[in-house]
Amino acid sequence: MNLFTPRSEINPTTTQELLYAYTGPAPVAYGTRTRAVLENIIRPYQYFYKEPNVQRALDIKTGCKEPEDINVEGPSSGFHTASVLKLADNFFRKYRPAMEKLKYWILVKLPKLKYAELSKGRQTYSFIHKRNLPAPIALEETVEFLEQNLRRKIGPTLLSYCQAIADVMELDETTYEGARDPRPWDIQLEEIDSDEEDPLFRQVGREETYTIKFSREELWDQMRTLNTMCKHLERGRLNRRTIATPSMLIRGFVKIVEDAAKEILENVPTSGVPVGGEEKLAKLASKQTFHTAVTGELSGDQEKFNECLDPDAMRLMWTVFLRKLGCPDWIMELFNIPFMVFKSKLADMGEGLVYTKGKLTDRKPLGEMPSEFDDLVRNVVGNSISCRLGMFMGMYNLTSTLLALISIEREELTGSHVESSDDFIHFFNCKTHEEMFKQAETLRLTLKLVGINMSPSKCILISPAGIGEFNSKFHHRDFVGNVATELPALVPNGTNPMTDLAMGLNVIKHSVNTGQMNLCTGALAMRIFNHAYKYAYMALGVTRRTRFMEENAITPLLTNQGASPVHSFSTMHLDEVALRRHLGLLDEETLRRILNPNNPVTQKGDPSMFFRIENKMPQIMEDYSVPSCFKYTLSRNRTIQDKPHKALLNKEERYQRVTSIINKLFPEVLIQEASAPGTVRESLKRRLELVVERSDLDEERKKRILSRIF
């Protein structure tokens, strides 16, 4: 990073976060994740027996246990096998149409799924580089790895991708060949644009190939490795939670199981997923009934949801469903693979405590000094720790919801239930209060049979029904609002006045439109936002900027200069410059000055660039807001070409270019999959020629353009 990078590319906050870890705005998670991971791993073992006995629990192979062993007071991990089988059977009989749809999906849709879908994920653990990479790049190198070792092309479908992984796992030794710069620190430049004021240099590329080898056992370890991270930007929590990201070797299998679960959940009335915001609210409203003598509404969370879930419980449930559908054995094995892998997962422990002085580092491995996690020492493998029980956050969201839903379909429970992973709301309809309490207790104990624990401190039962909370949406009869939780995030960035104003007003507009804010709240939110907006551009109170404007008798014309805001509820969707001109607040000369492309501070066409805080991955951002002279991005520093992330950045840029040209030439990809014969390049060329030939240009120009397409 050179000296002026902060001035040229990154805002001060980001710079501070890059240079000094552990500082920065509050909800950001910094530093080592080791403690959070160890807590996550030890919890399922502590909760397995009524009296915590980690040493004994470590010998457990599967999480099933007898009903009398279940801790009814505190959280309990594990499940009761017979109950899961019976509940799954019961659920299957009750929702026969949903199961038929699942069978149709397995026979017709599953073989057509493409593995390209996997590139839609976020960060993915790269088993080759042993760190997180963006999903498309991780997928690309995994496919390269498979093709290099199997010496054949891999078909486009997800099933052929999974089959290739199964084949690779059987090889005794696998290798991966890649290319890298042997001396990234030694930068050699060549001049490519000899402009006297600002010459442009390009780095001379050097490449050498390298080979990484895996034995069969090592590859299996990579397949079951989960990279762990702190959950980022969580508001209102003192302790950070961990989330896990698996490698692309297992993502394909997980995707199949999750999509199958989605197919069931879309056709089951009690699920709160996979529907989005407004539909969820409509679902909640339709569940409320007020016609019985006693009604109640129980809303709350499940405590330690991921730690107490067991992969085996999910596997059992799926096996029951698939067996009853009469699916072939290979489908049952396919659905079993991801749960088997998660049964033997290896979690990455992170850095731990590292003492550094100059170039000396001193790492303290687990078990060297006494700690509360000493029971786990026998499970340590290198810098990872194996963990049989429990799950990690962010893995099987839909399957875990399904597991919760099979347990509430009991004849004894009246009323209706909505569940979305660890969040739920249950409406009771009973004759007496005693009956309602009895049902609530039945619900709590039934959920314990599958390994889900209702949190005593976070659940509240309100009778008569009408007040509750689900998915951070609070309702009182019909009123549903959660924008108060969003207000702290409505802060202008301070890099571009036009975009900042448009984004802030957009959030408020959306909240008012969807009924999350009424008009008074909306007006207040607008006032708060305008205040923050002026403060961000030093136009509030007495500052250097306001003094300068006073001394030179400059009248403020726009809100970011200190003028009074012009937007109201009816005009908040309009651009500020256009609105002020329409209202006659800007004269012709001022308007020309603001929108003149030759302004000294008009925005440059270069896309700006920022680093994602979680993993310091560089990313390119484009800005689509209305250009004006107040849209000042200082011209970009060209040293970005020499960053250590250069190779990855180039890959990312090429990837974005290809996807954007495909989006432009094949607009149908937005709705469905575009199919064209030949390679991507040939089909793009053919489509481009077609566009030119059908255009209304004269023949001479058509010929000239067509000759330039190659």
Swiss-Prot record:
Signal sequence residues? none
Reactions catalysed: RNA(n) + a ribonucleoside 5'-triphosphate = RNA(n+1) + diphosphate
One Pfam family, short name: Flu_PB1
Q: PROSITE patterns recorded for this chain?
A: RDRP_SSRNA_NEG_SEG (PS50525)
Question: Its Enzyme Commission number?
Answer: 2.7.7.48
One example of the protein's molecular function in GO is: RNA binding
Give the UniProt record's GO annotations in the biological process aspect. Answer: viral RNA genome replication
Which residue range or ranges hold the RdRp catalytic domain? 285-460
Q: Which residues cross the membrane?
A: none
Protein keywords? Nucleotide-binding, Nucleotidyltransferase, RNA-directed RNA polymerase, Transferase, Viral RNA replication
On assembly, the entry states: RNA polymerase is composed of three subunits: PA, PB1 and PB2.
Q: What does this protein do?
A: RNA-dependent RNA polymerase which is responsible for replication and transcription of virus RNA segments. The transcription of viral mRNAs occurs by a unique mechanism called cap-snatching. 5' methylated caps of cellular mRNAs are cleaved after 10-13 nucleotides by PA. In turn, these short capped RNAs are used as primers by PB1 for transcription of viral mRNAs. During virus replication, PB1 initiates RNA synthesis and copy vRNA into complementary RNA (cRNA) which in turn serves as a template for the production of more vRNAs.
The UniProt entry's sequence similarity note says: Belongs to the influenza viruses polymerase PB1 family.
Name of the protein: RNA-directed RNA polymerase catalytic subunit
User: What species was this sequence derived from?
Assistant: Thogoto virus (isolate SiAr 126) (Tho)
